[in-house]
A protein has these predicted regions:
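Conserved C-lobe activation region of Hanks-type protein kinase-like domains
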Residues: 35-37, 46-107
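Forkhead-associated
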Residues: 194-272, 277
Length: 283
């Protein structure tokens, strides 16, 4: 997802080469490229992939076309991005923007990148930050069984594309835990449940600090044994896990009724941070 033409660190590169539609300001101007250039190109591609709209292809580009009489016509990369908070001269109605595709946290990153970070590369959000918030956005979506589109579970009462009712789903909410009390919410994970489902795997970042090198690691697998029983299977190392007890679990497995999971359970995990995780099935 990163423009290979920009892959450098802080070393100088005097050759100006860039991919059309993925221009990075400092690279086009002939300045040295760097990891900050990669971040800018990554942001363009991310916005395009999420919304199906290019962040700099708006009415400003259309109004300054090939037959324009302007002598100081701006290039695409010089225009404000299409959702600029201070300049709507390049706005666009194309694509799937807004709550359908972009969370508020992601909007903050895009604005920081394309507004504050356009000319000052040191203000661009780091790649680990992008990965974390893209993962947060993806993990809070559900797949519609009617049209096959994904949408943010907590924002819509039913599918915004085909209006089909929400499927039965597992909802997992993770909070910071301090002084025996749950604190600020840190993560939400949602997964649709169908009749044929065998198990649902919950990533480590729900229970522990987010680590970009461990995004695929599984901490808890919920196995649907039959129509009335489930099994919790933990993949823990040195973490302390508390479930319905003030004593840390010794066994890596715990069986319980499906009805109990429907009513909701909570798990406390203590590692580099302490988390309070609520898990339940909603219909």
């Amino acid at each position: 997802l990163i423009d290979a033409d920009n892959i450098e660190y802080e070393s100088a590169n005097k050759t100006t080469i860039f991919t059309p539609n993925f221009e990075v300001p400092e690279v086009v101007r002939g300045e040295s490229n760097s990891t900050y250039s990669d971040i800018y190109a990554f942001g363009i591609l991310s916005y395009l992939a999420i919304t199906i709209a290019h962040p700099f292809k708006g009415i400003g580009l259309e109004e300054a076309g090939w037959d324009s009489e302007e002598t100081n016509k701006k290039e695409q990369w010089e225009l404000p991005w299409i959702e600029d908070s201070n300049d709507d001269s390049n706005r666009s109605n194309n694509g799937l923007k807004g709550p359908l595709t972009i969370t508020q946290d992601l909007y903050k990153l895009f604005r920081k990148l394309f507004e504050n970070g356009k000319e000052d590369k040191y203000k661009r959000p780091t790649l680990p930050t992008w990965i974390e918030f893209l993962e947060k956005a993806a993990s809070s979506t559900i797949l519609c069984h009617g049209c096959g589109m994904s949408y943010y579970e907590e924002l819509f009462p039913n599918c915004p594309y085909c209006k089909k009712a929400k499927p039965t789903r597992l909802i997992v909410e993770s909070y910071y835990y301090k002084n025996e009390q749950k604190q600020q919410k840190r993560w939400k994970f949602v997964k649709e449940i169908n009749e044929d489902i065998k198990s649902i795997e919950l990533p480590s970042y729900i229970f522990k600090t987010f680590n970009i090198l461990e995004t695929d690691d599984i901490f808890l697998e919920i196995k649907f044994i039959n129509k009335s029983r489930v099994e919790l299977s933990f993949n823990k190392n040195d973490e302390e896990v508390y479930f319905e007890s003030q004593t840390a679990m010794r066994s890596l497995k715990k069986g319980l009724s499906l009805n109990k999971l429907e009513n909701g359970i909570s798990i406390i995990t203590k590692s580099d941070i302490a988390t309070f995780v609520e898990i339940k099935i909603e219909k």
